[in-house]
């Protein structure tokens, strides 16, 4: 869904100078559908799946809009470090959220409740923290672009801009190859991240709390890695940085498979 809609949403945001407004909309959508998972349980699998799909769609679309602000916030020679700061803060936010959820589950267990009974409430905690963390963006971030004239209507203009971009892509073969490669390696990374917790629980028999601790450790190392790698990216270049991270991913996956 994100792959199919992102080009049109991006064209619409550029034409209307609406990145911030769309980011607010996607943030609200992510918060609401994450919180809605609180109301799911046995017998509501379809509803839970729909909420997960919707929350991830809004989150992923919001990530694209956030990335579109980067050229406005950082000079080309500092994009790596600024991006690294952003990802590091995001991972620290994840640590805060997971820490709060882990504390809630521990408190529930101490009170004699089953862990499974307290898990739905962590959806509300996560949604609330995500909403609070987003507030500085909407209070202080400015939309620097100016709306463009739309003589043929905004929808027609967005489609026209998208068609022009696809047509011009033929003249930028490197960009086209990069976008295709990004599609595949991001899909692989997303699959690994999504299945990691499931693998830990089903194959390694991790409890819910063990899984949360694992995610806490992963987020902590990722925060340090993103912060440091941002500076490295500015020194060695973006292409080499991506190649280095993908080699690291491949190596770690092979080692995990052999373990």
Q: What do the PLM-derived regions correspond to, one by one?
A:
Residues 81-105:
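Glycine-rich segments within core transmembrane alpha-helices of 12-TM secondary carriers
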Residues 5-18, 224-238:
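Helix-to-loop junctions at the C-terminal end of transmembrane segments
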Residues 194-214:
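Short amphipathic helix-loop junctions that connect adjacent transmembrane helices
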Residues 24-43, 247-259:
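C-terminal ends and interior cores of transmembrane alpha-helices
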Residues 53, 167, 171-192, 196:
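Pair of pore-lining "gating" transmembrane helices in MFS-fold secondary transporters
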Residues 142-180, 203:
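Juxtamembrane intracellular "pre-TM" segments in multi-pass secondary transporters
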Residues 33, 44-62, 184:
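Hydrophobic core of transmembrane alpha-helices in multi-pass small-molecule transporters
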Residues 97-106, 128-147:
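C-terminal membrane-cytosol helix-exit motif in multi-pass small-molecule transporters
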